[in-house]
């Protein structure tokens, strides 16, 4: 019945280009702040509709469907009988020319890194599809799949890589020993600010 196009404020050129096509439609433009996690679906649904998804729920629970641009692109292609054989992949971090590429599924990380001019460090790890929700790999022969969103190249001695290699029990022990119960993590938690009972300091 109605569409909402969420886009971060920093993407000025994209906003101008898209606005031309949404003015005479039932699609509203929702300008989001330039911060994480404004792309989170709970945040998106609230920003675009002022509806709150129930805890542990999904957007459909409040009559919404959330998808990204690439998904809509692939749905369109499927509607005309074109299968998904290529993927948009962002390459950033310790590479000479950080870029986004449209590559065939099955392209190796080694090839993509070469497309980006190569690395600026010889000893590195690869975060696949994000630092928070992705995984860590050291295998450049690994390939792009339908779920690969991007790769981030970081030196092997980077804090995030050493942290990812820790066991959960060690991470919990360090967290408990360092926490002074200031509750800032809770007070600034995006879900808590929306009214959800998420209190990570406890």
Predicted regions and their residues:
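Short, well-ordered secondary-structure micro-motifs
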Residues: 16, 41-42, 137-140, 163-164, ...
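Catalytic cores of alpha/beta
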Residues: 114-115, 138
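Eukaryotic mixed-charge, acidic/polar low-complexity intrinsically disordered regions
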Residues: 136-156
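Immediate flanking context of iron-sulfur cluster ligation sites
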Residues: 118-127, 167-181
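Short acidic beta-strand-loop surface patches of small beta-rich interaction domains
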Residues: 8, 124-143
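Ferredoxin-type iron-sulfur electron-transfer modules in oxidoreductases and energy-metabolism complexes
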Residues: 154-176, 184-202
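Hydrophobic alpha-helical positions that pack around
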Residues: 2-109, 115-122, 130
